[in-house]
């Protein structure tokens, strides 16, 4: 008779940890044995410098299982109160079509993909982004649009920067209409300070008194007024200045588009196109400009090109504008944008089509007209003469009573000064909403009937000269998918073109494409998290308050910092926010002349781009032959900067994939010269539980929650880049003008539109830490084990360029293909494209060293998947040998022909290698074949023939 087990014996230990880690204990031992090691502890001892080791357990609560973690988080969510929020200010309730919710937002085929640097395996989301760009172009009336920015306020700041780059005016002054949203004004002011621009915020009648290089106008403005902007735009153009207009996207279905009014740049938020408010984000900003300014535009642009067979193929265009190439000379520091949310907004337009969108806009406007007429009949005056969905009302001494009445109805209004209240209707509003508002403003005995008012209130709130008369969304894609069946199949067709984590590992160095567990993702669509307005009273967001405070405590414990600022919406924005904190700190000590930022030559391109945005002078520090920061060069340049030294930006482990032994000494050099140390957190996944940035000597660091802490990359966003700071920098991090944050100085400007950035995805990172607890260190150790295993297995075929003590790498390694290219002409790009035929996304290409591939396997990939990648790389090396030996011509071989498509093998095959060698090179590909949608994309053609809108459907055939 078998022995009965007790409940404690039947409880599965480390349940989630074992789900999160790819290799099980037996596989880990096999991997360690291949390295000549007996334990992970031995590996870490050989790899991580002893001087920086964190030799105790993380101060985190014990790990919860998935059910318990979800239950606890559900308890937090239950403390949020989802009221009817009519606050507006760029945030509106919306209805996400369930076919999009289920098949995009909740679908790992969409949310686990990476930025489409490899277009051949990203044609689906590239097409979705092209739809978003076409939607933006049509609704704004301009020539060109990008594929999203972080939020409306950031987009406004980018518009200011673009205006300065292209304006022929010699002025250094930018004008902001005081009727722009206050959070936008704050972010623009913050950015202007970094750039050294003068900023004037005032009424538009003051514009004539200034010479400016550009101006920002709101349409409709923050109080709902709709003004004809043509006289102001003409005035700006007369002085060679640019007109930048922040517009409400839904209103543009009924209003004359700003491009037709003469605007040079139009920007705004696409949030109300099906993306929940989420207590502030994430949301995709749209950004459009005139064709003349295309090379000055920030962010990603999707363009139409052709592939090797001459077929239509999409790609990211004009990448030479961007930070990963131009560094401190880049147009922007944008890296992560908001691709997943842009896709949702674009699909919202595809699903509803032009007629459906117009009906939504007309309905919102009609309800607003009925409300305006009813209130006016009872003597409540309207401040804004014209309107789309927003009313600003004079209520005088009744303000307090009306606010209390609204609270009784669980309605949030916008509270303004001077006895005024504001409200904005949205697509979730209906007749009952209007009736409730009549009750709030007039009392229950108002006697108004919505149906009667609907028949009587014929007048539009939009002035006739500003009614839209041009067509929009005329491309067939916006008319072909209005049934759920057709939409579902369209989404699936696009998804099938792409390669994401749900199909294979994505070994991108410096990107940490780890598991995004389903239990971590579930809470983001809970209504209690998804449907809160970011400016709702704090007591209505008590659950968010608990979640954010707890997450901040955990991140402090993990990093050693004293305080966290959650506002940055991406890693690059975290860099910018951290550098601003350093700048403010120096200024508080009357050392405002400290503006030199030292950056290692190996740094990610966002580092110098962010430093330039923060008003700093970038000085490059060289690296030695081992890939480490050249300590003597660092000392010399710190000495030369002297009292002008602001900071050092350093990545740890380095972007070369090693733990630099001298990192503490590097920090000491900077501190001895009065500078601060900014640690780029891109590689934090190799530190958690093993070392802490603050202990090493960092004063500030950003944490990529979309890397280390499991927020998915979304095909290019969303991301989150909160910063950790030591106590002396804590007063100088970002604050917010609408929702003041405890801790930072009140005068500190915002860096993003919402006080806690993209708050609705914070539950993902909360869940990850709650599920792992102190065992987060296990994840770091297994990530290091996986990287060293790959390095060991591949080093005989592809030399590992850099290694640290005992020949070990950190969590990633760089494979050097330069010798092979010199011998055979086979490049790192050829290998990257060939990996697609094996069913893999390529490693990071030519960063940080040209001619190399940087591989990061993460802790989440099984040994079987690692071995499959090793098999693919060794097979590719054998193919290169065939070229070396002359068996295949230098220009006719599987690498130069890669990637191969179904179209290749269904036509005439006249190549020096077989079809099987081309498309079925391994047993796995014969059983589970992924087909790239297009052949190799012609990048040069795409940039020389720039076209960034939807192409005729016939061109795809």
Swiss-Prot record:
Q: What does UniProt list as this organism's lineage? A: Bacteria, Pseudomonadati, Pseudomonadota, Gammaproteobacteria, Pseudomonadales
Subunit structure, briefly?
The glycine cleavage system is composed of four proteins: P, T, L and H.
According to its UniProt record, which protein family does this protein belong to? Belongs to the GcvP family.
Q: What is this protein called?
A: Glycine dehydrogenase (decarboxylating) 2
Role summary: The glycine cleavage system catalyzes the degradation of glycine. The P protein binds the alpha-amino group of glycine through its pyridoxal phosphate cofactor; CO(2) is released and the remaining methylamine moiety is then transferred to the lipoamide cofactor of the H protein.
Gene Ontology cellular component list: cytosol; glycine cleavage complex
**Coiled coil spans:** none
Which transformation does this protein catalyse, written as a reaction? N(6)-[(R)-lipoyl]-L-lysyl-[glycine-cleavage complex H protein] + glycine + H(+) = N(6)-[(R)-S(8)-aminomethyldihydrolipoyl]-L-lysyl-[glycine-cleavage complex H protein] + CO2
Q: What is its EC number?
A: 1.4.4.2
Ribonucleoprotein: present as a keyword of the record? no
Modified-residue entries (N6-(pyridoxal phosphate)lysine), positions: 707
UniProtKB keywords: Oxidoreductase, Pyridoxal phosphate
Q: By its UniProt entry, which InterPro entries does this protein fall under?
A: GcvP, GDC-P_C, GDC-P_N, GDC_P, PyrdxlP-dep_Trfase, PyrdxlP-dep_Trfase_major, PyrdxlP-dep_Trfase_small
Species for this entry: Pseudomonas fluorescens (strain ATCC BAA-477 / NRRL B-23932 / Pf-5)
Keyword Disulfide bond in annotation = no
Name one process (GO BP) from the record.
glycine decarboxylation via glycine cleavage system
Please name the top-level EC class of this enzyme: oxidoreductase
- Cofactor(s) for this protein? pyridoxal 5'-phosphate
The record's GO molecular-function terms, alphabetically, read:
glycine binding; glycine dehydrogenase (decarboxylating) activity; pyridoxal phosphate binding
Pfam families, A to Z: GcvP2_C (PF21478), GDC-P (PF02347)
């Amino acid at each position: 008779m078998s022995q009965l087990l007790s409940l404690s014996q039947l409880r599965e230990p480390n349940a989630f940890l074992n789900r999160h880690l790819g290799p099980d204990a037996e596989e880990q031992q096999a991997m360690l044995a291949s390295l000549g090691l007996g334990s992970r502890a031995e590996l870490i001892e050989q790899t991580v410098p002893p001087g920086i080791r964190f030799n105790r357990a993380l101060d985190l609560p014990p790990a919860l299982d998935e059910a318990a973690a979800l239950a606890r988080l559900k308890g937090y969510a239950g403390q949020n109160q989802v009221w009817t929020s009519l606050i507006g200010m760029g945030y509106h309730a919306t209805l996400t079509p369930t076919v999009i919710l289920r098949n995009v937002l909740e679908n790992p085929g969409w949310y686990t993909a990476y930025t489409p640097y490899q277009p051949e395996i990203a044609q689906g989301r590239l097409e979705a982004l092209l739809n978003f760009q076409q939607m933006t172009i049509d609704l704004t009336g301009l020539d060109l649009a990008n594929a999203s920015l972080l939020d409306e306020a950031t987009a406004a700041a980018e518009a200011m920067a673009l205006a300065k780059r292209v304006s022929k005016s010699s002025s250094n002054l930018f004008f902001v209409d005081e009727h722009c949203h206050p959070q936008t004004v704050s972010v623009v002011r913050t950015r202007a300070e970094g750039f050294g621009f003068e900023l004037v915020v005032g009424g538009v009648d003051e514009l004539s008194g200034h010479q400016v290089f550009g101006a920002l106008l709101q349409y409709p403005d923050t109080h709902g007024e709709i003004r004809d902007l043509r006289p102001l735009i003409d005035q700006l153009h007369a002085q060679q200045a640019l007109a930048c207009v922040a517009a409400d996207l839904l209103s543009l279905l009924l209003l004359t588009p700003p491009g037709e009014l003469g605007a040079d740049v139009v920007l705004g938020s696409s949030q109300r196109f099906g993306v929940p408010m989420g207590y502030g984000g994430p949301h995709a900003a749209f950004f459009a400009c005139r064709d003349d300014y295309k090379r000055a535009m920030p962010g990603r642009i999707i363009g139409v090109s052709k592939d090797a067979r001459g077929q239509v193929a999409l790609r990211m265009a004009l990448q030479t504008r961007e930070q990963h190439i131009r560094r401190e000379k880049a147009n922007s520091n944008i890296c992560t944008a908001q691709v997943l949310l842009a896709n949702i907004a674009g699909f919202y337009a595809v699903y509803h089509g032009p007629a459906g969108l117009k009906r939504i806009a007309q309905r919102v406007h009609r309800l607003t007209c009925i409300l305006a007429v009813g209130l006016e009949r009872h003597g409540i005056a309207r401040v804004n003469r014209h309107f789309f969905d927003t009313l600003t009302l004079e209520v005088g001494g009744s303000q307090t009573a009306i606010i209390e009445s609204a609270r009784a109805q669980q309605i949030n209004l916008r509270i303004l000064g001077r006895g005024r209240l504001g409200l904005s209707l949205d697509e979730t509003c209906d007749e009952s909403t209007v009736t409730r508002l009549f009750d709030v403003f007039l009392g229950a005995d108002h006697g108004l009937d919505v149906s009667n008012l609907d028949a009587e209130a014929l007048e539009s709130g939009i002035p006739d000269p500003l009614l839209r008369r041009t067509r929009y969304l005329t491309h067939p894609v916006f008319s072909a998918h209005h049934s759920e069946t057709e939409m579902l199949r369209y989404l699936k067709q696009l998804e099938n073109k792409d390669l994401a984590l749900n199909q294979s590992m994505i070994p991108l160095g410096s990107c940490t494409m780890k598991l995004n567990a389903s239990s971590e993702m579930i809470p983001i669509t809970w209504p209690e998290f998804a449907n809160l307005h970011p400016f709702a009273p704090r007591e209505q967001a008590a659950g968010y308050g608990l979640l954010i405070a707890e997450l901040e405590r955990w991140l402090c414990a993990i990093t050693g910092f004293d305080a966290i600022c959650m506002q940055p919406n991406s890693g690059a924005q975290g860099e910018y926010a951290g550098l601003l904190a350093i700048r403010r700190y120096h200024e508080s000590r009357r050392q405002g002349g400290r503006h030199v930022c030292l950056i290692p030559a190996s740094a990610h391109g966002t580092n110098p781009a962010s430093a330039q945005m923060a008003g700093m002078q970038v000085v490059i520090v060289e690296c030695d032959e081992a890939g480490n920061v050249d300590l003597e060069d660092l000392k010399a340049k710190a000495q030369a900067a002297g009292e002008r030294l602001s900071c050092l930006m350093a990545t740890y482990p380095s972007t070369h994939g090693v733990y630099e032994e001298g990192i503490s000494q590097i920090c000491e050099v900077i501190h001895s010269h009065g500078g601060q140390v900014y640690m780029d957190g891109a590689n934090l996944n190799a530190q958690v539980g093993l070392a802490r940035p603050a202990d090493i000597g960092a004063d500030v660091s950003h944490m990529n929650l979309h890397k280390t802490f499991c927020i998915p990359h979304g095909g290019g966003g969303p991301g989150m880049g909160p910063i950790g700071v030591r106590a002396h920098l804590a007063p100088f991090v970002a604050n917010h003008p609408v929702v003041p944050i405890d801790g930072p100085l009140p005068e500190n400007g915002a860096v993003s539109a919402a006080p806690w950035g993209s708050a609705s995805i914070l539950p993902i990172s909360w869940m990850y830490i709650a599920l792992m607890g102190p065992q987060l260190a296990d994840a770091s150790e297994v990530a290091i084990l996986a990287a060293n295993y790959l390095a060991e297995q591949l080093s005989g075929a592809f030399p590992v360029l850099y290694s640290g003590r005992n020949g070990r790498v950190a969590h990633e390694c760089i494979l050097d293909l330069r010798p092979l290219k010199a011998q055979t002409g086979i490049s790192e790009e050829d290998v990257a494209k060939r990996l697609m035929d094996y069913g893999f996304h390529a490693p990071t290409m030519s960063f940080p060293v040209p001619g190399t591939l940087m591989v990061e396997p993460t802790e989440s990939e099984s040994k079987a998947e690692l071995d499959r990648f090793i098999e693919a790389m060794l097979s590719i090396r054998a193919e290169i040998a065939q070229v070396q030996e002359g068996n295949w011509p230098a220009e006719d071989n599987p690498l130069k022909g890669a990637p191969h498509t179904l179209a290749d093998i269904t036509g005439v095959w006249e190549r020096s290698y077989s079809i099987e060698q081309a498309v079925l090179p391994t047993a796995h590909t014969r059983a589970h074949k992924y087909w790239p949608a297009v052949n190799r994309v012609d990048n040069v053609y795409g940039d020389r023939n720039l076209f960034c809108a939807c192409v005729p459907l016939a061109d795809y055939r």
